[in-house]
Amino acid sequence: MAQENSLLNRPASQTSAHFKIIEIAKSFPETADTLLLDKYLTNEEAASARVFRVYRATPPHYHATCDEYLYVLSGRGTFWMEDPSKIAEFEAGQLLFFKRGTVHALPEILEQPVVFLSVDTPRRDPKDVVFVDPAAGTPETFVQAV
């Protein structure tokens, strides 16, 4: 809990908090066993907010229960949403958005660390990761909470 509170500008209450997003982004380790590591900032019924670092390319997948807004804090890579033939690059300062059920992937990481600030509406259950190819992974191999 001490580390969690050290990443806040002021102590969290039941109704508000002020997070040091860049410090949280820098706190992720250099390597991970899963494709990404995830830090929940808020987890309300209407929405959740997270910071996560992507360590390896992510295979095509979707989220069945939430829309996702991804603000790129650092790094560069490629992504596609809906159509794998329409690959584009992402970089810090960009916002990616997709509705629930939209298949998406990050096929290539061009510059580490790739870190996103995510807002999910409604809240995202950590198990809500559905791989297009079930052999590509499970929620447990996809993400680990820190």
Where are these regions (language model features)?
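A generic "binding-loop/recognition-motif" signal
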Residues: 56, 65, 102-103, 112
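A short beta-strand-loop-beta hairpin characteristic of the jelly-roll/cupin
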Residues: 69-92, 129-131
